Amino acid sequence: MQMSSKVWSAIKEEVALRIAAEPSLEKFLTNLVLKQSSISSATAAIIASKIRSDALASDEINNFIKDAYTRCANIEEKLEADLEFFKIMDPACQYYSTPLLFYKGFLAVSTYRAAHCLWNHDRHTMALFLQNRASEVFGVDIHPAAHIAEGVMIDHGTGVVIGETSVIEANVSIFQGVTLGGRGFNSGKPVSYTHLRAHETQRN
């Protein structure tokens, strides 16, 4: 899917400058960003390069995530909103390409977005596989059934757990060591439920 946006154009310009500054990373940055057609395709390629395993190679995971993204309503806008929110809220984030390439919180939420779409299309096993790999690699555990709006920032993120009963609205910041959602069951029903409103911040 070909997409054109101000953010995507800025990302490509930033990555070209990164290559000029660090030529040894040219192949890495070219393959994962400059050869891609949109924020979603670049995000899928970067995630796949991180969470590949003996079970599924990078190309296979890339295809699964891209396929999931095609089923997600407004996925480009959601990923773009996440990047925008990072740039606004994190003083250390001066470029859109920084969370895309290097922030595990952004990549964990982006993996969740693919898993959530798969979950909603009854592909629970693949959704849980993506959840598990993201938890192992990024240290952020987000259940595919959770509901997360656009414009969410998980900063640092180590030890963040977002359960299946969680609802997170737009423009919410979450830091490390935070658990949200059900922690137990009573007669088959969750006994805890978390709803983070817009503009909330959750810290350990």
For every predicted segment, state its role.
Residues 1-133:
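Terminal amphipathic alpha-helical/low-complexity segments used for targeting or macromolecular assembly
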Residues 118-128, 133-140, 144-145, 153-154, ...:
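Glycine- and small hydrophobic-enriched segments that form the cores of compact globular domains
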Residues 121, 170-171:
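Secondary-structure boundary elements
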Residues 142, 148-150, 154-156, 162, ...:
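Hydrophobic face of beta-strands forming the core of extended beta-sheets/solenoids
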Residues 184-186:
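Short glycine/acidic-rich loop motifs that flank beta-strands on beta-rich extracellular proteins
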Residues 194-201:
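Conserved small/polar residues in nucleotide/adenosyl-binding loops
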